[in-house]
């Protein structure tokens, strides 16, 4: 018998790209929120998912940079930082499914293979990219301080092309780090059929939310965001119409599994 949460499966499971659940995360999040054309968001949603109602801010978007450390329950990655650390940049919108309001990731890039495969298991549409973000410091002048006037920046590139860049100038402490990414995630997992006939071998609607969440003090400020064209990306279709604000916060959470809401959706 072979074991493993992902390929390659072996007798021991040690070669699997993904370690066993649960996964524990600690990281810093730089969030930029803005409004775009709701019809552009609608174009990114499956047929069984609808836009939020007009009074639920259907054009709201969160563009988030994250600098993560993540380990499995036995902490094996703590002694091997290359498997512990990764960065990602992702775009979150809100949507309605079965008369409930959800958050949903429509684009996401990561810089490690295990992070990409982990996302595919969870229904995140992860792709590989180059993700960079500035880190707050508490000593010296080699980085921004978490104080009024502190500037935090993030960049995203893929296939040698700059896709996005953001800057947040802090104003002061805040109660939260935005609102768009504050709901349970609704994702569609799928696997195209090997017959290449346009059908799927796997089609599921799933949801997930972290447990054992710990949050630092959030900071808010003024945000700037630029998106750039690429022949293989569609970020500019959801370009900002109105900037809402920027945020920084440290987050700790655990992913112990999700829930299948529907199989073979129409």
What are these regions (language model features)?
Residues 40, 89-92, 198:
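Short, hydrophobic/aromatic alpha-helical segments in well-folded domains
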Residues 2-15, 121-266:
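Interaction-surface and assembly-scaffold signal
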